[in-house]
């Protein structure tokens, strides 16, 4: 160190100044690489038998790794993604639920109560005044039932899915693997045999899905499945009646469809998709909540709710699932139809999605497999205004 003659302050010596100057011009320190770094890396990769790193995936498809030098392609890193449960169509009208005492709590007049929310989830028709494809809840339309609607402030009447199940699903197991039967001939003199495919690889049989849900405050999931299973049993017994249109069309009203969407690491694109034909809950671990032990204050057995579903048919990687998923969304919210969606909703760009978590309606682009989220223009203006980003131009917005 030396004293600067002009300022009188300590400064660097000539040697130190030279070192600092060299550091300022060091491309590795400033840019993280040298101008020919890419070429050097490529040369090392080629000499080692790995091929060009930037085209490793292409090379694996095109040719044979005859040097056995290893494969630099990264492993698949798909996320578990999302699981959607479509809403069934139970008949939880006043005349029905008054026939069984265990269903009576759903007569609650409080729109923010859990029993009222369960009633709205499981009976979307009644929650919208008998109009499954109509306007806002509580607004009568031509031909709609004259009974009083029972919407809930905790349930989006225009959503086709049971959100509380999607948001609290911990695990799901039991999806079957495709399997093909074979025929094998009788053995010959030298025990020679021949074999061939002798069956179908499609999955049309029944199977069980085991699910576990996080038991959140108020225990709404246990009550939801309790009502669901009790209703199905009481309909079979003849105590409760399905809606007339379900009887006429010979449909089962307590069934749901489970969609499984495997997403990429950014949760932007659907990598794989599956669904069962239909499913319905069979059992629920409600008994565990009544276990007792004086060793602990809180019942740890009730941390999760276990539910077994009976499913029929498994559909994997079928493009028709994209259309059926989108059609299901439109069935509950006609404004999401391709002809009207852009006049009512705004597609969220990735940079804005965290602001609108828990808000919006999904759509899968059939060409790019992007999982889009659309929010109403009113919600968009409100939330962007509340966060001070209304005039944000970070990215152009889809209109």
Predicted regions and their residues:
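Glycine-rich, low-complexity intrinsically disordered segments
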Residues: 2-399
